[in-house]
Amino acid sequence: MLYWLTQLLQGQYHAFRVFQYLTFRSILASLTALIVGLLCGPLMIRWLRGLQIGQMVRSDGPQTHLSKAGTPTMGGVLILLAITVSCLLWCDLRQTSLWLVLLVTLANGLVGWVDDYRKLVLKNSKGLPGRWKYFWQSVIALVAVSYLYWNASLPVHTQLTAPFFKTVTWDLGIFFPVLAYFVIVGSSNAVNLTDGLDGLAIMPIVMVAGALGVFAYASSNAVYSNYLGIPYVPNTGELTIFCSSIVGAGLGFLWYNSYPAQVFMGDVGSLALGAALGIVAVVVRQELVLLIMGGLFVIETLSVILQVGYFKYSGGKRLFRMAPLHHHFELKGWSEPKVIVRFWIITVVFVLCGLATLKLR
């Protein structure tokens, strides 16, 4: 909205031409989302407390988590509000890719909201049954991928580029939608599994989103993409602003989600933000780079898969003390803040490795 207004004023006031630049609007978008999060956070927390929407704690989990019972959750609504407001203000709303990414994010947030609502308000301990959650995630992903694949306004490259190798590519052809589907749904669920400690998931989300914003910026520019050896994907520059909005909204949420947390994001936040990372990576054709930068999410997911598989194969034995992996380290005696910060450090390394693929080819 404000971007459209500045476009009208450019003819009379040359100073407004600065709003043409993605970098400038990205900064404003991030600051806007941050301010919305910081200002609305206390109101959201009080509102959730008034509704008695508090976190339920696993009885078989670390004993230190018992004190978290009753902490307001569904705070992901605040994150999505900040992202949406920021994008509506500073993005060029004529870009189809922006609406695709934003709608996928909000749709997955709706699935998470229903799950949280059933668990916390209706007191249904199972929430939204897993098969239905996966069904609706799949529907959203398939609709998005189909639109991306067949819509002429979003030219899709079916080539999968290998990170660190300039000339190694695989043309997926009709299998592109399959890969894209698994990236979106897998990313959504991986972030959901990681969101188990105060601030553990949101900071890696912020870091990965910021890095994806760099890729979106480079991919939307023919000169930069050719120089860096990455796919050129036109009409995707506004995704830089979308990613910047995630950064700002995430930092605003972290203000209240840092240890000891005043609010949790819930499935409404984790499913939405995970899907956001996935769909952005698909649109800018950086699926394998997302696998690198989101290495923490991958490790957490693999720990659950290995734990379940080993438990069934061994007849009841466990590979880890508890899954996901962050609980394993808690039960080994690590304090919660130590687990969180060390996992953040791991994410910094993964994100730097992902960014290194821009130049090391």
UniProtKB/Swiss-Prot annotation:
Where found? Cell inner membrane
Q: In its keyword annotation, does this UniProt entry include Chaperone?
A: no
Q: Which GO terms describe its cellular component?
A: plasma membrane
**What is catalysed by this protein?**
UDP-N-acetyl-alpha-D-muramoyl-L-alanyl-gamma-D-glutamyl-meso-2,6-diaminopimeloyl-D-alanyl-D-alanine + di-trans,octa-cis-undecaprenyl phosphate = di-trans,octa-cis-undecaprenyl diphospho-N-acetyl-alpha-D-muramoyl-L-alanyl-D-glutamyl-meso-2,6-diaminopimeloyl-D-alanyl-D-alanine + UMP
Q: Which GO terms describe its biological process?
A: cell division; cell wall organization; peptidoglycan biosynthetic process; regulation of cell shape
Q: Which InterPro entries match?
A: Glycosyl_transferase_4, PNAcMuramoyl-5peptid_Trfase, PNAcMuramoyl-5peptid_Trfase_CS
As recorded in UniProt, its EC number(s) are 2.7.8.13
EC main group:
transferase
Instruction: Report the cofactors.
Output: Mg(2+)
Q: Look up the record and name the pathway of this protein.
A: Cell wall biogenesis; peptidoglycan biosynthesis
Q: What GO annotations for molecular function exist for this entry? A: metal ion binding; phospho-N-acetylmuramoyl-pentapeptide-transferase activity; UDP-N-acetylmuramoyl-L-alanyl-D-glutamyl-meso-2,6-diaminopimelyl-D-alanyl-D-alanine:undecaprenyl-phosphate transferase activity
Q: What topology in the membrane does the UniProt record assign?
A: Multi-pass membrane protein
What residue ranges are annotated as transmembrane?
27-47, 70-90, 97-117, 134-154, 167-187, 199-219, 236-256, 263-283, 288-308, 338-358
What keywords would UniProt list here?
Cell cycle, Cell division, Cell inner membrane, Cell membrane, Cell shape, Cell wall biogenesis/degradation, Magnesium, Membrane, Metal-binding, Peptidoglycan synthesis, Transferase, Transmembrane, Transmembrane helix
Q: Which domain of life is it from?
A: Bacteria
Q: What is this protein called?
A: Phospho-N-acetylmuramoyl-pentapeptide-transferase
From which source organism is this entry?
Legionella pneumophila (strain Lens)
Its organism's taxonomic lineage begins at: Bacteria, Pseudomonadati, Pseudomonadota, Gammaproteobacteria, Legionellales
